[in-house]
Amino acid sequence: MKNMISIIVPIYNVEQYLDCCIQSILAQTYQEIEVILVDDGSSDKSCDICKRWAEKDDRIRYFYQENQGVSAARNRGIKEARGAYISFIDADDYVYDTYCEELLEILIERDLDIIYCNETNVLSDGEVVCHRDSRIVYTWESEAYEYNRPKEHITVWGALFRKENIENIQFAEDLFMEEDTLYFAMAVRRARKIGYYDASLYNYRILEMSSCRGRFDKKKYTEIEAWRRICKVFEDWPLTKLSAEARFAEICNFMISRYSLDAEFDETVVNEVIRECRKNLPSLIKYNLMKGRIPVKHMVKGLFPHLYILYLKEKSKWMKVGK
């Protein structure tokens, strides 16, 4: 359908938040939508909630599949989508009522392939951390896209995509981290023009049980592979590739800082992360110098990672002694 928006919601054991999410979608001022709920094998009451809403509103289409992961759920949603535009909303998040209307209007007026907005962070205790919105629209040719800048966007939620630009792109089902970041990178690579709308229309819940939080495990290691692929996506876009490699080095430094005390973050993993960090460190330095910054902290971590890990371990011992 010409201007229909297909809203894809991957679902897995989110009964606590699902009503709020679906209600916010159905309350959209822009009514030409279909809501594709893909239940990825939930064991809680998510299935019952989805069926109840589907009975109330014929714009909802509910699909159930055995547990295969969020990437498979999103891929199923894309396959089932009938709209000309696609938006992804996580089942534990919710959107403001003008989310679809405002993004679609900008995308059409500016002839964009992708438009994304700001988010409001909703903490686990219910506290809402708002951003000051200018409601200004920024647009640029996709080849000028950069990571590591204030207006960047690296995930699929909070964005509206022209379907013809992304329908043949698949979420990587072998990744458990940054699979949406890789997908967004591939969408940018396919796009002609993208835009950023400085308005907080998407409410993102920060939950302790989120896959990007907690202790290190082998699934989190797939973040390294995701960023390898992202850098490869932009192989022939010099500026974007440079900024992606700079971000990759930062990601490696972050993993060392956050997980070096975890048992699963063993020597093999540490050495691989350090290898990737050192490989991309020149890009981090070059990119920051281009922007008038000197990344001293990242340089120290990247050049002397084993000393930094030793420091973190000693610091942990001191803190335990002091308790």
Feature-to-residue mapping (PLM):
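Short, well-formed alpha-helical segments that are part of the catalytic scaffolds
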Residues: N13-A27
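Catalytic core of nucleotide-sugar-dependent glycosyltransferases
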Residues: S200-L207, R213-L242, F254-L284
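A conserved acidic beta->alpha catalytic loop
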Residues: S24, Q31, D39-D48, D90
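Membrane-interface aromatic/basic loop that binds lipid-linked glycans or pyrophosphate carriers
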Residues: L261-K323
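Donor-binding/catalytic cores of nucleotide-activated saccharide
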Residues: V70, A91-G195, Y202-K219
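Cell-envelope/extracellular polymer assembly enzymes that use nucleotide-activated donors
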Residues: N3-S6, S24, E34, L182
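Short aromatic/hydrophobic "clamp" motif used to bind/position activated sugar donors
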Residues: I86
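Glycine-rich, basic loop-to-helix element that forms the pyrophosphate-binding segment
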Residues: Q65-A81
